[in-house]
């Protein structure tokens, strides 16, 4: 029954992770949209609608996966967790390079703490569990493919379907990136509030 528990923990981590990206300190959209080459980092390609849809799809997938449990689902969760760690690392490096001349001293960006502090340990625990229980190569491959399919369903497809340079759902607060106004290309944030 540990597989279901670990999958449940993954979705609790998702709530913590999204809270860091959106609110504490918030501003994940700035780094994500910068990585995607946006000239309007408050709304394109990620806006509040696409980001909320991503989380809704991920949680819906959780409602399906938790009861199923099993090794393939656990490997999919591990792949997703590693995707988060790698993604936040790459975005952090990019933002550090762009903003070091403006005083940025680390690769931290919204979501990095929970990616490293929660998702990375979860991925390691799942990998150890998978090895310990003797999961076969086929399960590993199917799990990784399932994880990639989940990323496509939760992130890529909603963004492709709903992105809009003139979105009516822009972010209204740059969060962490308020301290780096140079990062806020094309955004219409109330910076004096």
What positions do the PLM features span?
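Hydrophobic alpha-helical transmembrane segments in multi-pass integral membrane proteins
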Residues: 116-136, 189-190
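Interhelical loop and helix-boundary elements at the membrane-water interface
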Residues: 43-44, 89-117
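Transmembrane alpha-helical segments that form the membrane-embedded catalytic/substrate-channel core
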Residues: 15-23, 78-95, 149-175
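Short, highly charged, low-complexity non-transmembrane loops/tails of multi-pass membrane proteins
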Residues: 164-193
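Alpha-helical transmembrane segments and their membrane-interface junctions
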Residues: 54-76, 126-144
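Interfacial segments of alpha-helical transmembrane regions
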Residues: 2-12, 66-81
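Core segments of transmembrane alpha-helices
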Residues: 47-64, 114-124
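Juxtamembrane helix-capping/reentrant segments at transmembrane boundaries
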Residues: 30-51
């Amino acid at each position: 029954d540990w597989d279901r528990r670990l999958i449940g923990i993954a979705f609790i981590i998702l709530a913590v992770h999204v809270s860091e990206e959106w609110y504490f300190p918030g501003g994940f959209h700035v780094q994500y949209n910068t990585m995607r080459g946006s000239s309007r980092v408050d709304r394109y390609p990620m806006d509040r609608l696409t980001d909320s849809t991503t989380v809704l799809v991920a949680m819906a997938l959780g409602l399906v996966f938790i009861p199923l449990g099993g090794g393939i689902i656990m490997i999919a969760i591990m792949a997703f967790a590693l995707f988060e760690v790698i993604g936040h690392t790459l975005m952090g490096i990019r933002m550090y390079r762009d903003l070091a001349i403006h005083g940025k001293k680390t690769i931290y960006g919204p979501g990095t703490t929970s990616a490293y502090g929660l998702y990375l340990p979860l991925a390691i625990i799942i990998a150890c569990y998978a090895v310990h229980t003797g999961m076969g190569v086929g399960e590993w491959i199917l799990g990784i493919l399932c994880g990639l399919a989940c990323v496509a369903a939760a992130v890529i497809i909603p963004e492709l379907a709903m992105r809009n340079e003139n979105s009516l759902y822009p972010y209204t607060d740059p969060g962490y990136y308020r301290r780096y106004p140079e990062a806020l290309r094309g955004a219409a944030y109330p910076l004096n509030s």
